[in-house]
Structure formats: C-alpha cells, structure tokens
Amino acid sequence: TPIKSSAASDVYKRQILQYVQAGQEGGNAFADVVSGDVTPSGKMTDTWAKDYYDYPGAEVYSYKSGDLMKEKYEEGIFVGYRYFDTFEVPVRYSFGYGMSYTDFEIRTNDIKVSGRGMMNPKVSVTVTVTNTGDTYAGKEVVQIYASCPQGRLVKEFRRLAVFGKTKLLAPKESQTMTITFPLYQLTSYEEESASWILEPGMYGIWIG
C-alpha cells in the first residue's frame, strides 16, 4: 500500500514507532518498548516514499487509468524496493530500515557456494554481529542482498536473498552466525523459454 510520510516526518524529526495490529498483548509490548525494557529490532517490510507520486503506480491508480474495475501493474520486475533501488529514487524510509536503542557491528567472515546442479547448490554467508552499545541488550537482523549481472535479461539493481536474526545480545557481546540461501534465488525468468536462468557474469553480495 503506498504511504505518504512527508507530514509525519515533518512533525516527528527523530523517530516513529509503527504500531499496527499488535493483538491482545499489544499494550504490554508497546509499554515494554517505550519504557526501554525491550529494544526494538523490527525492520521495514516495504518502502516509504517521500511523496505519493514517487510510487511508480501512482499515475495510473484507480480512476487515473480510466478503469475503476481493473488495476494494471506496469512496474514489471521493479516492484517495491526494487524500483526505488534500481532507479535511485530518494525515499523517506527504505525497505529493511529499522532503528534500535543500541548499535551493532556486522563483520563478514566468509562467503562460499556449495553443492552441484541448479536445485542443490547454496550460498552460505558467515558473519559476526557485535552489540557495540554500552547500555541496552538487543537483537539485530542481518540482511543479505544480491546483485546479478546485467546480461540479456533485465534485472533489478539488487534483491533480498535471505535474512537472519541474532539472539538477544548484551552490550559488547558477539554472535557468529551462518545464513544460507539456495543458488536459484539468483536466477531470472526468461519468457521465451519459460525457464529460470542463471546468467554468467559477476554477482555481488551485500551484507547489512
């Protein structure tokens, strides 16, 4: 759902706590977070643009397309954060963004590919996450993105391949974790052959 966040950002300069459909324990959870008993560790699952018309579908949505009964998505593969990343559109809050009461350092230890064929190989990324803060314990979400070569198939700038969450880390505590994802996550669909293709070229891994 497109969200216009300019007004909220002007009023709340430092932070916004998104509190949606929290359930019967939502009140207790809210109190735990605002009191500092629990450190927030959630990340954005979509992109908040600076302006409504920054969303690619804004110009043809609803009555603007001339047909209230149908909505045509013209973005192709550039849906959500893939559009904003690929075309370098400035945003208010990016996909995967989220604040915490503490700070973390993520150090990459190893990246390797194992297995054979198309369905069995996997990419393993090993990182060490350290809570570098002095006061609050917290959890961090490690996000792994991949950039695919721009060959004959059109691709987005980068895609989310996998993510993993640490345990609750005390100040100065570290955790080493290995996060894996199947190699076919890096394939692209070719309509002519109706198949998923892993094109040759340079692939990039983004960790954060």
Walk through the language-model features, giving the residues of each.
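Glycine-rich beta-alpha loop elements in corrinoid/cobalamin-binding modules
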Residues: 30
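Active-site-adjacent elements of ketosynthase-type condensing enzymes
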Residues: 59-67
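Acidic/polar loop patches that form or flank catalytic/metal-binding clefts of enzymes
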Residues: 25, 39-58, 79-80, 90-93, ...
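Intrinsically disordered, low-complexity Ser/Thr/Gly-rich stretches
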Residues: 78, 88-92, 101-208
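Residues embedded in well-ordered beta-strands within globular domains across many folds
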Residues: 12, 17, 45-48, 110, ...
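Acidic, His- and aromatic-enriched active-site or binding-groove loops in soluble protein domains
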Residues: 15-27
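Single conserved hydrophobic/aromatic residue that forms the stacking wall/gate
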Residues: 1-8, 12
